Design a protein with these regions (language model features):
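Charge-dense, helix-prone N-terminal extensions
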Residues: 1-116
Length: 116
């Protein structure tokens, strides 16, 4: 899909930690297999065959939305939205690269598999 938006624009006027978190996240997601980054006006979507995650940059942090088939019970989840019978959007605020841990990657990998 061709758009007028590029990934780099999402990091203008943002703290360097925002880019560090994004780069760390993308590096880990690459281990799942092939995927595409699709930049939009307000976010960057990560796609396998369909979108499995969305990344919105803020001044000092990232908002990661994971698209999954069941709610996640964790204090890390800031919002859960049921969008259909078996689909949930899970919102997680990431403020440091250290938050990209095994738990988060397990959730992302589940979403990646679901989107394939």
């Amino acid at each position: 899909m061709t758009t007028d938006f590029i990934v780099e624009n999402h990091f203008e006027n943002k703290s360097p930690v925002v880019r560090e978190i994004y780069d760390g996240l993308i590096k880990k997601v690459k281990s799942f297999g092939k995927f595409q980054k699709e930049p939009h006006k307000t976010s960057i979507h990560l796609l396998n065959q369909t979108t499995f995650a969305g990344i919105a940059t803020r001044k000092d942090y990232l908002l990661l939305t994971i698209k999954i088939d069941s709610p996640i019970k964790s204090s890390r989840v800031t919002k859960t939205e049921q969008v259909s019978r078996n689909r949930y959007h899970i919102l997680i605020k990431l403020e440091t690269p250290k938050e990209i841990d095994a738990e988060l990657l397990e959730w992302l990998k589940d979403a990646y598999k679901l989107s394939g």
